[in-house]
Amino acid sequence: MKATADMYTYRVFWSGEDGAFVASVSEFPSLSNIADSQKEALSGLIELVADVLVDMRESGEQPPVPLGCRTYSGKYALRMTPEQHRRVVMEAAEQGVSVNQLLISRV
């Protein structure tokens, strides 16, 4: 599958520090675009990602797979301290749910 810029995961938010809208893209954490409007921030970043994809392909690099195109197993191994584990088990027991149900409710 050849990913295109519009297939990636974008987010636009207001930055009080910058006094402008900032667009970011999950698959390229080092890229962002700042503009006066949400629309300009997003469209500018999509154009930037398109340029980056061209550059990556020309240099033989493999672009990241868009998050929406990845497959997920539904399983996730979680490591925690013994104390955290004890607290989670106790809280789950107090709520009358399994540890798995408790942790899923927190996500």
Regions found by a protein language model. Give the residues of each.
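Short, positively charged
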Residues: 3-4, 11-17, 35
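Aromatic- and charge-enriched surface segment that lines or borders ligand/interaction sites
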Residues: 43
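Short, charged, surface-exposed hinge/linker loops at domain edges
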Residues: 1-9, 46-105
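Short aromatic-glycine-(Arg/Gly/Cys) micro-motifs in beta-strand/loop hairpins
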Residues: 12-29
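Short amphipathic alpha-helical segments
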Residues: 27-31, 74-76
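A short, exposed loop/beta-hairpin motif centered on an aromatic-Gly-Thr core
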Residues: 29-40
